[in-house]
Amino acid sequence: MADRLTQLQDAVNSLADQFCNAIGVLQQCGPPASFSNIQTAINKDQPANPTEEYAQLFAALIARTAKDIDVLIDSLPSEESTAALQAASLYKLEEENHEAATSLEDVVYRGDMLLEKIQSALADIAQSQLKTRSGTHSQSLPDS
């Protein structure tokens, strides 16, 4: 996962892309402007362009990206965060890390104990099968 600044940069780049796409699509689909001095022939048979739908779509995308940017900015550490607050936060994270490490060590220990039990049971099963097979072979041999 990227850090907050990289996420913020990606969101700003995405917002810029959305603005460029919105302007391009609206320019392409928008109705032609009429100039009083210039006579232009407009094809009346052209189908109506869904510019309103595009406008709503791009407005929603831009608004959502702007909200994402606000959330990312709010998640950045503030200037009010003093060294003491940062040290306390770091200490808390270290405690959580030690607790997680202890829990992991306990789980690994229990896993090793289960592995030993399983290996012992498998060895007993293999030994029993060998005894059964050797007993079956000795009984099946004809007496000569």
Swiss-Prot record:
Gene3D superfamilies: Mediator complex, subunit Med21. GO terms for molecular function: transcription coregulator activity. One of its GO terms (biological process) is regulation of transcription by RNA polymerase II. Pfam families: Med21 (PF11221). One of its GO terms (cellular component) is mediator complex. Disulfide bonds: none annotated. Signal peptide: none annotated. It comes from the Eukaryota. The keyword Transcription applies. Component of the Mediator complex, a coactivator involved in the regulated transcription of nearly all RNA polymerase II-dependent genes. Mediator functions as a bridge to convey information from gene-specific regulatory proteins to the basal RNA polymerase II transcription machinery. Mediator is recruited to promoters by direct interactions with regulatory proteins and serves as a scaffold for the assembly of a functional preinitiation complex with RNA polymerase II and the general transcription factors. Belongs to the Mediator complex subunit 21 family. This is Mediator of RNA polymerase II transcription subunit 21.
